[in-house]
Amino acid sequence: MTNIRKTHPLMKIVNNAFIDLPTPSNISSWWNFGSLLGICLILQILTGLFLAMHYTSDTMTAFSSVTHICRDVNYGWIIRYMHANGASMFFICLFMHVGRGLYYGSYTFLETWNIGVILLLATMATAFMGYVLPWGQMSFWGATVITNLLSAIPYIGTNLVEWIWGGFSVDKATLTRFFAFHFILPFIIAALAMVHLLFLHETGSNNPTGIPSDTDKIPFHPYYTIKDILGVMLLILVLMLLVLFTPDLLGDPDNYIPANPLNTPPHIKPEWYFLFAYAILRSIPNKLGGVLALVLSILILVLVPFLHTSKQRSMMFRPISQCMFWILVADLLTLTWIGGQPVEHPYIIIGQLASIMYFLIILVMMPVASTIENNLLKW
């Protein structure tokens, strides 16, 4: 009798994706972040579901409903902080996952990579709308500033912004629709993640060397299931350290002040995981130019496969490209720092230089480094 996991229509899908999946024998811990993102998504959907049971998406009661969750609902405080800090863990894993893809040349799987970029955009949209829901000062002003950016679109901009707002300012209609979208998007993300996996399993995983590993594959279970469980345990450990010891470390104190349209906070800034893009937006003195730079800072990932000039896939044996990659990482950390600083000297010029460097490294320096390395191979 054949094993049920290989014959049952549903079990067969699970088996081919998580049990008998042929996997390269040498993939490192950098390949753990895919499964960690899956865990983060499940965690966010579950905690979010329980929060939605007690939350009210009305401007008059939203802030107090979040307070009610933290004070009066059984374990409401831990659910709320797991959800808020879970988003931070989600983005840490996302950035690591994308960084791994860039370093080891995983972007040559075009369909997988492009769906990954769509997933990144969808996750950013979800996180932004979730940040608006507690209806604190930073929620309100963040929503006002970011949605207002669309008014930079020529001709239709103003109409588009008012259409998104559902009125002439960020108000009840905006909050209600953001709650609706914030609830539905994670399920769309889950569906897209399935498609992401589907395309990945068409080609099989990449590995640190970037060399095809068809001659040396091992089953996913037990080798990588146990490795993933270790990753998940570390993720939960870090998350719970954050939640139980410093739950507000990554948040903004201004969000504990109820939203007030008549009082602008001194420094409007998004959550830490958007600061790099926010710094790029602010570094251009022109509104439309800033918006374009903001969008391109993420969409530039779509161009990466076409900018790959190297004869080798991975950066493992390419020291000049490695150097460029780590300069890019340092540049992104600089942008993240600048995004949280006020708009004054010397932060303005640092932000502008870091923004120029960001695009220069990806569009010019990395392809040039690859070409130099190709020529060095001939020596």
Curated annotation (Swiss-Prot):
The lineage of its organism: Eukaryota, Metazoa, Chordata, Craniata, Vertebrata. Belongs to the cytochrome b family. The chain crosses the membrane at residues 33-53, 77-98, 113-133, 178-198, 226-246, 288-308, 320-340, 347-367. Binds 2 heme b groups non-covalently. It is a multi-pass membrane protein. Keywords: Electron transport, Heme, Iron, Membrane, Metal-binding, Mitochondrion, Mitochondrion inner membrane, Respiratory chain, Transmembrane, Transmembrane helix, Transport, Ubiquinone. Its cofactor is heme b. Heme 1 (or BL or b562) is low-potential and absorbs at about 562 nm, and heme 2 (or BH or b566) is high-potential and absorbs at about 566 nm. It holds the Pfam family Cytochrome_B. Heme b b562 binds at residues 83, 182. It comes from Capra cylindricornis (East Caucasian tur). It is found in: Mitochondrion inner membrane. The keyword Transmembrane applies. Its main location: mitochondrion. GO terms for molecular function: metal ion binding; ubiquinol-cytochrome-c reductase activity. Gene3D superfamilies: Cytochrome Bc1 Complex, Chain C. The cytochrome bc1 complex contains 11 subunits: 3 respiratory subunits (MT-CYB, CYC1 and UQCRFS1), 2 core proteins (UQCRC1 and UQCRC2) and 6 low-molecular weight proteins (UQCRH/QCR6, UQCRB/QCR7, UQCRQ/QCR8, UQCR10/QCR9, UQCR11/QCR10 and a cleavage product of UQCRFS1). This cytochrome bc1 complex then forms a dimer. Heme b b566 binds at residues 97, 196. This is Cytochrome b. One of its GO terms (cellular component) is mitochondrial inner membrane. One of its GO terms (biological process) is mitochondrial electron transport, ubiquinol to cytochrome c. Component of the ubiquinol-cytochrome c reductase complex (complex III or cytochrome b-c1 complex) that is part of the mitochondrial respiratory chain. The b-c1 complex mediates electron transfer from ubiquinol to cytochrome c. Contributes to the generation of a proton gradient across the mitochondrial membrane that is then used for ATP synthesis. A ubiquinone binds at residue 201.
